[in-house]
Structures are given as structure tokens and as C-alpha cells.
Amino acid sequence: MVSLLENPLRVGLQQQGMPEPQIIVIFGASGDLTWRKLVPALYKLRRERRIPPETTIVGVARREWSHEYFREQMQKGMEEAHPDVDLGELWQDFSQGLFYSPGDIDNPESYQKLKTLLSELDEKRGTRGNRMFYLSVAPSFFPEAIKQLGSGGMLEDPYKHRLVIEKPFGRDLASAQSLNQVVQKYCKEHQVYRIDHYLGKETVQNLLVFRFANAIFEPLWNRQFVDHVQITVAETVGVEDRAGYYESAGALRDMLQNHLMQLYCLTAMEAPNAMDADSIRTEKVKVLQATRLADVHNLSRSAVRGQYSAGWMKGQAVPGYRTEPGVDPNSTTPTYVAMKFLVDNWRWKGVPFYLRTGKRMPKKVSEIAIHFREVPSRMFQSAAQQTNANILTMRIQPNEGISLRFDVKMPGAEFRTRSVDMDFSYGSFGIQATSDAYDRLFLDCMMGDQTLFTRADEVEAAWQVVTPALSVWDAPADPTTIPQYEAGTWEPEQAELLINQDGRRWRRL
């Protein structure tokens, strides 16, 4: 595997500078995200010499662990989640920068002990007062953690102290606004990094370059040439061990309002004045403010929810959502959501955007598909000569890349046409173009680059778009009225009707 420093796509490019040494404080450090994603991402950056060796990680959680036990747990987690990663001499050096501070989210004494430890580590590790506080805890704990950090004086330096907040940011518009008020009481906006790890993926970042750096595509990126857009994020897994969280969230809050909305924004936004954080985020806010559900008066024509029922995945029988451990047998929580957006602006007027996401679907895939209009000519009328619309697809996962489908004549004496794909894949370079995206996001946060993080008004604008659906779906409902789809299938029948009513159909992936 070729390392990032040997990535052929980066040949001839100036490397991003190295951030200053700093302490990264992870709240909720006993959770699996820490050993599955966060610590491995930071270790990857260290292996690639993208962060200084003085970089220090402090885990915070309720369990009474020692520094050494925390290091052992992180190593065990690395061995389990990333068995191919070398944990030799470099890991031993890296792990000496791992520390632990036990404490409760709502206990001021815990924060004072943490503050004392951070001061000691500044002297010992040479981190110069630079801090990143990463909230990897249940969303209900966000306000209290921020209040305790703020009142304890740990967010007071607007240039050295940064706050990273995992999604979801709120559970509706009102709670997002309330959380923003808490954040703004103790932080400047430039200190706050609302993380969405989808924005760390190569293909997502490549969207802006693909659109605005290539003259052959941007002129076609509008209502004159685009028939519709489909954005899909499909998962094969079920709720697994997240029933407690998922029952209160569902597919709309867990996936569509954040991950899919970010893909949507980058697809639909106007060109920013500059490739900097505020310019890009301002354009995302503008397109969100112009976005609406297609029909809020007849919600079924613009939004569909569903739940997976018992079925088969890869030859194995799997239970339905309501029979999963920890799930209410009468749950109305959606594991599938499909929505139709319209954009009231000059570029996209009349072009529908169809977004869908679900669990227990036939395959794990995330993509953006731009469906162009069919040619107006009737010259290809016979069945053998029938042409198909061009489709530009950006694959987010797996096999990240970009493909363009177009029609050609088949070789031979007969005049027959067929569709072919012109394809670019990051894998063709012999590199792993993406990891879990957290390494890029960590590095950007350490460098103070907010481009791939959401701004306060952007979060609120995204919640505003889906509020009409939430207001209906959050109301008590008869469980028998929730559409079902068998595990291992693509969607409930009602979701098919959502797009079929417009004379279109979902892509079969």
C-alpha cells in the first residue's frame, strides 16, 4: 500500500504544513469510536509525519482507568479494528502520549482535575497551551460539557482552544438553535468544529474541484441539461448495538439531515468566491435556504419513511427492526427515509433532487448520480438504436471514484447502441485514497481550517428543510401505518411511488 506521502495524485503539489503540538481531549473515550476511528486516525497522521511527535491525547470518561490501562485498551482496539497496522516501535512512542482523566460530564471537580492534568502535560510534552476538546458523547451531554468547559476557563483562548462536536447537532431546529446559543456563549464561531465525517472523504472533497475546475462540466450543471439528481447512502447493517440511540434518532436524524444534506449542498451550491471556509459555507447556506420539500401539504408525495422487516442478508436470516434487542416492539422509528427536494433558484428551478438512505439494504453504497436530460432528437427510434440518458456518478463508497455513462455504437455490421462507462477510480493509483476520513478532519481542525465543518447557520438551515417531515413523523402514529421493506431489499413500495410518480425510477446499485 502506498502511503499518503507517496500518493501519485499529490506529486508536484505542496504539502499542507504541520500543525503546532497540541493536546486532544476526547470526551467519551471509553466508547468504541475512540479505538475504532479516532486514535487510529491520529496514529495514521503520526505515521505519515503529518502531526508533531509532541501531539498528546487525553481520554475522559467515567471509568476509573489509569494512564497505562487506557494505553492498553487503545492498543487492543487497534489490534482488533486495524490488524494490518504496524504497532511496533512507533506505536510505543505514540502511546506514551496517551493519558486518561476519569470524571463525570456534570461534575465541576472532574474538569478542574482535567485542567490541572492539561497544565502538567503542557510542561511535560511541550504543547504550548493548544487544546482540542472532542465531544464524542451522547448528544444530550453536549450542552453540559460545553458549559463546564466554558465556566472552567478551558475555552477562553479563541486562538488556542478548539471545540469539536460530533453529529447529530440537535434533534430538530429548536434544539439546534438552543445548542448553538450555548456554544456561542462560551466560544467564537471560529473555535467551533461541527464534524460530519462524510466531508472528509476524498470524493466528497473532489466534488468542488470536479465541478468548478473543469470547464466541460460546470456549464451543464443546471436545469437546462440536468433532468434530476439522486443521492443514495445505503447500509447493509442493522441497528446493531445502537438501539438506545437509534430509537430516538432514526434514519432522518442519523443520516439524511447531516450526511446526505452535505452531499446535496456540495452538488447544488453555487461557485464560492474563494476556496476558503467561509466562502464555501456561505454558498451551502444559500442553497439550503432555497431548498424545500416538494409538497409539504401532501407529505407522501415528497417524503417517505420505512422500517426493515425480517429478511435475508448474504444468505443469513436477520430479524426485523422491531425485534432487535432494545427496540420497542411498537416502534415507529424509521430505518429508511426518502425525500424529494426542489430548489427555488435560477440554476435548479424545476429539477428534483431525490435523497434516500436506509439500513439492511442489499449493498453498502454511497453515491451522487447526475441524470442528464435525454437527447431531443428522434433519430434513434428502433429498439436496437434506443439511447439512454447520460449519467455522471460520483461514488463515495466503496471504490471511490467518478464515472460517466454515455452511449456508443456496438462494433459490427448492424447499427446497435449500448451504454458504456468512462471511469476514474482512486484504486487505480494503487493507493487507499480514503480511510475513515477522520484523519483529514483531525488535521484540518489542528490547522484551524473550518472548510469541511458546518457553521451554525448552516446547521439550522438544514434542520429547517426537514422540519415539515419531522413535525408529522414525530407525532404518535399507529405502528401498522409505517411502511415495511424486507431486509435485503432496496426500499418500501411507497418510496418507489415517490419517484415513479414523476416518470423516473431509483437506480439499482
UniProtKB/Swiss-Prot annotation:
NCBIfam families per record: zwf (TIGR00871)
Taxonomy of the source species: Bacteria, Bacillati, Cyanobacteriota, Cyanophyceae, Nostocales
Task performed by this protein: Catalyzes the oxidation of glucose 6-phosphate to 6-phosphogluconolactone.
GO molecular function, one term: glucose-6-phosphate dehydrogenase activity
Listed Pfam families: G6PD_C, G6PD_N
Origin superkingdom: Bacteria
Catalysed reactions listed for this entry: D-glucose 6-phosphate + NADP(+) = 6-phospho-D-glucono-1,5-lactone + NADPH + H(+)
PROSITE patterns: G6P_DEHYDROGENASE
EC number(s) per entry: 1.1.1.49
Species of the source: Nostoc punctiforme (strain ATCC 29133 / PCC 73102)
Keyword vocabulary terms for this entry: Carbohydrate metabolism, Glucose metabolism, NADP, Oxidoreductase
Protein name, UniProt field: Glucose-6-phosphate 1-dehydrogenase
Active site per the UniProt annotation: H259
Keyword NADP: yes
